[in-house]
């Protein structure tokens, strides 16, 4: 939440640059990546980091979310984000469709035959 930044210079920079993220989301990482695609949702500021770390801010809800995938993989990020959004009651049809397009949970072999699935099996705990 920009209004909680106590440093005036940093707060001013955030006010100027956050809208640019939504205007040019591909600059976050490049085309076709979660970090770029999710920032099309004007209510979200999100960025992945090293070793499977991901951070998300929901502006209107004033919620910050972060998680880390122990083995560092990024492939499951869309599944995890979608489940987090489901559990907290956040829904944007375009964002949901994009998350499913990146990973729908179905594992396929080289012949595109489904051979398994990945499911999220966690329940969020509130810490505030």
What feature does the model see in each segment?
Residues 3-128:
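Structured C-terminal helix/loop/strand segments within mature extracytoplasmic catalytic/sensor domains
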């Amino acid at each position: 939440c920009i209004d909680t930044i106590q440093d005036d210079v940093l707060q001013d920079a955030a006010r100027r640059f956050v809208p640019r993220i939504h205007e040019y989301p591909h600059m976050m990482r490049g085309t076709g990546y979660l970090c770029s695609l999710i920032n099309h949702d004007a209510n979200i500021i999100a960025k992945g980091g090293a070793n499977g770390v991901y951070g998300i801010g929901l502006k209107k809800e004033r919620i910050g979310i972060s998680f880390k995938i122990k083995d560092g993989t990024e492939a499951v990020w869309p599944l995890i984000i979608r489940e987090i959004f489901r559990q907290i009651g956040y829904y944007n049809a375009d964002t949901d469709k994009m998350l499913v397009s990146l990973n729908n949970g179905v594992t396929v072999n080289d012949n595109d035959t489904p051979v398994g699935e990945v499911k999220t099996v966690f329940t969020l705990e509130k810490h505030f």
